[in-house]
Amino acid sequence: MKKLLALALVAPLLVSCSSKKGDSYNEAWVKDTNGFDILMGQFAHNIENIWGFNEVLIAGPKDYVKYTDAYQTRSHINFDDGTITIETIAGTEPAAHLRQAIVKTLLMGDDPGSIDLYSDADDVTISKEPYLYGQVVDQTGQPIRWEGRATTFADYLLQTRLKSRTNGLKIIYSVTINLVPNHLDKRAHKYVGMVRQASRKYGVDESLILAIMQTESSFNPYAVSRSDALGLMQVVQHSAGKDVFRSQGKSGTPSRSYLFDPQSNIDTGTAYLAMLNNVYLGGIDNPTSRRYAVITAYNGGAGSVLRVFSSDKVQAANIINSMAPGDVYQTLTTRHPSGESRRYLYKVNSAQKNYRRR
């Protein structure tokens, strides 16, 4: 089993993860992605062997999942639900394993490139500027910055909120911590300056950038997915990333470390939004109709958006230009072949309305 785990864990070296697929994939990347899917399936299978049936958790766009202690302890931050769950199946001193994981999770920094979410390496370091600072408060209502306060809170949680459940012959011990009610806003606030800079650089509305970030990752800088998207705006290295680099006169594709850097990720994602707006979908005259098309294309590609209206790109733009923006929205949310893309437009458009009101 250790050999299989080792095989699964080389996946990040082969290809990065993601949630959406663009139009410009090359054959080699498709092969890499298929291989990555196989490796991730094996990784999930081995986690199931260790934790038991229905106990597989793997990091995703809105879920930070980190295994330690030979995969016997894990930290799970659900950025959508606003919960942190620390669990262990360690047979000896489970409270000690939970305490250490609680402290490190509460005090970890915001450098995704330093943490391997696909190994049990003890690579989560305590930061002077914890990523979760202000998103979690202790039993006295105070935010947690220092190790002493985090340890005291961990002991309090172990005394008052420790739970256990059985799965086969395994006992799973867990502690759940709720993030503060406005945790989403607190995370978004961390990136407002970077968003404003990218907005001015590329001429993309700040509210749209923030809405894309919320929908893609819930402002999780550790965001990964199984199809090759990385970081806050879930940029795909070999499609959007490559297109942006080419437009900027750079060769190759952005690296994992580049896209895990929040500022670089936001810059690249915003540059791609500008390309969709000004180049790929620039033939759409009405700015509202074009915005609906750009949002949908960020998820499923510009080609798939135009093909909803016609197989001919010029004719598709002409048809869109003959329609009212509301009809374009209705068409994209009901006739786009991808259910994910149909829902994506609704989610981003709704989120953008909230950011526009601020």
From Swiss-Prot:
Has the keyword Lipoprotein been applied to this entry?
Answer: yes
Q: SUPFAM superfamilies per the record?
A: Lysozyme-like (SSF53955)
- InterPro entries named in the record: Lysozyme-like_dom_sf, Murein_transglycosylaseC, Murein_transglycosylaseC_N, Transglyc_AS, Transglycosylase_SLT_dom_1
Q: Where is the signal peptide?
A: 1-16
Where are lipid groups covalently attached, annotated N-palmitoyl cysteine? C17
Record's CDD domains?
Answer: LT_MltC_MltE (cd16893)
Q: Where is the lipid attached (S-diacylglycerol cysteine)?
A: C17
Record-level GO BP terms? cell wall macromolecule catabolic process; cell wall organization; peptidoglycan metabolic process
Top enzyme class of this protein?
lyase
Q: How does it sit in the membrane?
A: Lipid-anchor
Which family does the record assign? Answer: Belongs to the transglycosylase Slt family.
Q: By its UniProt entry, which NCBIfam families does this protein fall under?
A: PRK11671.1 (NF008670)
Q: Provide the function of this protein.
A: Murein-degrading enzyme. May play a role in recycling of muropeptides during cell elongation and/or cell division.
The name this protein carries in UniProt is Membrane-bound lytic murein transglycosylase C
Gene behind the chain:
mltC
